[in-house]
Design a protein with these regions (language model features):
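Central antiparallel beta-sheet cores of small beta-barrel/beta-sandwich binding domains
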Residues: 1-75, 82-94
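A glycine-anchored, Pro-Gly-centered beta-turn/N-cap motif
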Residues: 1-4, 808, 813-815
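Solvent-exposed residues in well-ordered beta-strands and their adjoining turns
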Residues: 8, 23, 36, 61, ...
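A cross-taxa feature marking solvent-exposed loop/turn segments within ectodomains of secreted
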Residues: 13-15, 40, 65, 88-90, ...
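Beta-strand-rich interaction surfaces with strong enrichment in secreted/lumenal proteins
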Residues: 44-46, 69-70, 778-784, 808
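Short, structured interface segments
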Residues: 92-100, 204
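Edge beta-strands of extracellular beta-sandwich domains
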Residues: 92-95, 829-833
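Glycoside hydrolase catalytic-domain context in secreted enzymes
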Residues: 103-802, 811-825, 834-836
Length: 836
């Protein structure tokens, strides 16, 4: 049994190749193991050999960490046995002597027979002709099949769905797209069935939620929105698309572009915050990143804007809850990011789970057909969210599945995600004359058009590139891009001079459940490299001598640890500076992760209180997916660093900021409330007839606290200071065909180089309906050395002043306006002008 052995194992998650190296050193056996295609670190420290059998135990690290157990029986040049490891469970092994061929090479060999050369991008005229020719050949069942999506395996993203095996559905032409094919081998397997066994050999879309990275994980979208760096966000999305497409993924279930004002809602972590203008700019950047210049490019994936529309307005911040807003709010607040994404060329849109005017979005003709398609001109693929069509009847807006399917089709829904309402009901509805086959033709026409546009109709296997995947996924280049964007996403909320820390002197105590945690990636990521996440401990110890860093967890995220507080206090006593690493676990934000109480868990608050009693310089480093209530911390710690979930390079990025290797420049895209009773609190609220006043009792205010947030939209500190000159306008009356130039000079008045995000807001003083007190209309990020100043210019035109007015027409109304410029939405200068 001495030597190298290998086995190939099929699992629900991925195909694995496990290579064992067995050695005998003076009668002591040892085993090392390498797992290919999925990073699993195996360390066997206890090996027992009896005859032709071997038993070993040790530790394994993959998506989870835990015990590993191995049993092998050898017979000449072959072996059988079992391996039990976290994430995968018990695997049956059957292998042979030798290292064998790598899975990448085996897959490339399989693909050789399918590789095509000379395939060129079709013209739109050629695509249209090909689509019509193919559409005329399809049976009703095949058309419904193109409109139906199934899961790649029995792994489920939500409630279990009764369905036939994907292999059968694909072979019979009953599925046109696949969700959740996380393994490149599975992509090949199902695509081969589609093009070799289905009636007209139509290849499949392979869909996945690539929200903030594929294998290299970037900051969660709420975090990267705080960078205000649209170019950096676009690069991150392009990298995510490159990694995903190399593994055969062609269709993304992102970006999420919902406007979010209620931090209780868990899915704020997936969006760009509370502002429509910034949300629109970031939506554009994400679409361009994912889709590139051409969807025919193999390094791109189809972008899907979600969730249309107003999902972020769920009452009480409770996921899937009722939405009850005016059409003016719908258009002025929630529509701009979708409109911008569509103008940027997004190929797909996904419906929201909520109702609008009493009708679930998935079945709303007004939302999907009248507004999205007819008014906004969207001609791409409309994809239902998971179970949304069946849920029309659960809402109580359809009597049964048949009526729900009819409503969704009438609303121009093209693809049903995973559930089977279309498959079960559309043939019968057509037979009864309730819906027309021409409606199916419209949907299938859109689907096939995109299958031609991405090139799979001419080269079905063009995206399956195992060598490319091996080369680019989690590459050093991509990790450096992740680190760069992570640094820009960090927001310094408070600093009384304790930061930056000195990397060459003094001692640091890292205390808290996130001191050495790898739970820094956030929700909606499926990276196989989670175990390689850079922790805060790693980042800090690389920045300074490891001898000067003391570490104690103190408590778990939401549970005490025996002796945890005592150990933390002992460590804190030994240090010059304390870094409190507190926050939420990744499961505490995201889908179905709403919270009533958005403070830190009680065990962490108690830990912080005990540490604060020591009176030592204390820095709070937050890991979280939403704005939190930080009023106590603002009063009791010296510095607060909001890091969100920063991704694969989180620890390095945080250390870069803590020790001054990078001057923080992030600005909040959601307001932080002082108290949960303020929620929702956002900067661009309407005025009232009785604005808040301390002098007037009968005004719109609380008796027991301020109306204002603790940290407003656009807020973020730096290690330097910036001074703003008075605002200058080139004119004070703006004619409709003209433009107005706003000028302000920003100077770095501190001692460090820094970046400032200069923000411009407008206020329409009087409209046909009440307008917000401020609206962001421009921003510019500028990097200044100490003593350096720069003139910043913004151009305002009539277009910037338009909104959906009382009659719901999009227009700018003549009258007086104010312009505000400053470092955030609160601390601004103002000047007036008039539109005529």
């Amino acid at each position: 049994m001495i030597g190298t052995w290998h086995a190939i194992v099929e699992t629900k998650i991925a195909k694995l190749k496990i290579t064992f190296s067995i050695k005998d050193t003076n009668g002591e056996y040892s085993i090392s193991a390498v797992v290919e295609s999925f990073p699993v670190a195996l360390d066997f420290d206890h090996v027992t050999v009896e005859g032709s059998g071997l038993r070993a135990s040790g530790r394994a690290k993959s998506l989870q960490e835990g015990e590993a157990y191995l049993e092998l029986i050898f017979s000449q040049n072959k072996f059988t046995g079992t391996l039990n490891i976290p994430t995968f469970g018990t695997l049956s092994l059957a292998g042979e002597r030798g290292p064998g061929t790598s899975l990448t090479d085996l897959l490339e060999q399989e693909l050789d027979q399918y590789r095509m050369t000379g395939v060129v991008e079709r013209t739109e005229e050629s695509i249209a002709a090909a689509v019509e020719q193919l559409l005329g050949q399809l049976s009703l069942q095949e058309k419904v099949g193109q409109m139906s999506q199934c899961l790649a395996s029995d792994f489920s993203f939500g409630e279990e769905v009764a369905s036939e095996p994907p292999e059968k559905l694909v072979a019979e032409g009953k599925a046109g797209s696949i969700l959740g094919a996380f393994d490149i081998n599975r992509v090949l397997e199902l695509q081969r069935i589609a093009v070799e066994q289905s009636p007209h050999n139509i290849p499949l879309f392979f869909n996945a939620d690539v929200i903030h990275g594929h294998q290299t994980i970037f900051p969660v979208p709420l975090a990267w929105s705080c960078s205000w760096d649209t170019e950096g966000i676009q690069r991150a999305c392009a990298i995510a698309a490159k990694e995903a497409s190399s593994a055969g993924i062609t269709y993304n279930h992102g970006p999420m572009v919902d406007i979010t004002r209620d931090p209780r809602w868990g899915r704020v972590v997936e969006g760009a915050g509370e502002d429509p203008y910034l949300g629109a700019r970031i939506a554009e950047a994400q679409v361009r990143g994912f889709q590139g210049n051409s969807l025919f490019d193999q390094d791109t994936i189809i972008a899907c804007l979600k969730h249309f529309i107003a999902y972020g307005a769920a009452e009480g911040g409770r996921d899937y809850n009722t939405v009850d807003i005016s059409e003016g709010t719908l258009r002025n607040v929630h529509l701009p990011p979708f409109q911008a994404g569509i103008q940027a060329g997004a190929g797909s849109v996904m419906n929201a789970f909520n109702i609008y005017q009493g009708v679930p979005a998935a079945g709303s003709k007004f939302l999907m057909k009248d507004l999205l398609r007819n008014e906004l001109g969207f001609d791409g693929i409309l994809l239902s969210d998971y179970g949304a069509i069946e849920e029309i009847s659960i809402h109580g807006c359809a009597e049964d599945e048949a009526e729900a399917a009819r409503m969704a089709l009438d609303a121009t829904m093209d693809i049903e995600m995973v559930t089977r309402a279309f498959a079960n009901q559309l043939p019968k509805l057509i037979g009864e004359g309730i819906v027309k086959e021409e409606q199916l033709d419209e949907a299938v026409r859109r689907i096939l058009t995109y299958k031609y546009r991405i090139g799979i109709m001419d080269d079905p296997f063009r995206y399956i590139r195992p060598k490319k995947a091996l080369e680019c996924q989690f590459s050093e280049e991509h990790l450096q891009e992740s680190r760069a964007l992570a640094r820009k996403s960090i927001v310094l909320l408070k600093n009384d001079g304790v930061l930056p820390l000195n990397a060459s002197s003094g001692t640091v105590a890292l205390i808290g459940p996130f001191a050495r945690s790898k739970d820094l990636l956030g929700t909606w990521q499926f990276s196989r490299h989670g175990n390689a996440t850079v922790t805060l401990e790693q980042g800090v110890t690389e920045a300074v001598s490891g001898r000067r860093v003391f570490i104690a967890d103190g408590c778990a995220v939401d549970q005490p640890i025996d002796g945890g507080y005592e150990a933390a206090l002992q460590v804190a006593e030994e240090a010059d500076v304390i870094v409190l690493a507190l926050g939420e676990s990744s499961r505490m934000s995201g889908e179905a992760a709403s919270r009533m109480n958005i403070t830190l868990p009680e065990v962490q608050l108690k830990l912080a209180e005990e540490i604060a009693k020591l009176g030592k310089p204390t820095v709070l480093v937050l890991t979280n997916g939403r704005p939190l209530i930080l009023d106590w911390f603002d009063r009791h710690v010296n510095a607060i660093v909001e890091t969100w979930f920063l991704g694969s390079q989180a620890g390095h990025a945080i250390a870069d900021v803590l020790f001054g290797q990078y001057n923080p420049s992030g600005k909040l895209t959601m307001s932080f409330p002082r108290h949960a009773g303020q929620i929702p609190v956002y900067y661009n609220h309407f005025n009232t007839g009785r604005p808040a006043s301390q002098e007037k009792h009968f005004s719109s205010k609380y008796l027991d606290g301020s109306n204002d947030p603790l940290y407003p939209f656009g807020f973020g500190l730096s290690y330097t200071t910036f001074d703003y000159s008075e605002i200058k306008l080139d004119k004070h009356v703006l004619k409709r065909a003209d433009s107005l130039t706003v000028q302000v000079t920003v100077a770095n008045t501190g001692q460090a180089q820094g970046e400032e995000i200069v923000q411009l807001y407008i206020q329409d003083i009087c409209g046909s309906v009440v307008r917000p007190v401020k609206e962001l209309k421009g921003f510019e990020k500028v990097c200044l050395s100490p003593g350096e100043s720069r003139e910043i210019h913004f151009i305002i035109t009539e277009e910037d002043l338009k909104y959906y007015a009382a009659d719901l027409t999009f227009k700018a109304e003549a009258g007086d306006f104010k312009i505000y410029v400053g470092p955030n939405s609160r601390d601004v200068q103002e000047v007036s002008f008039r539109l005529e």
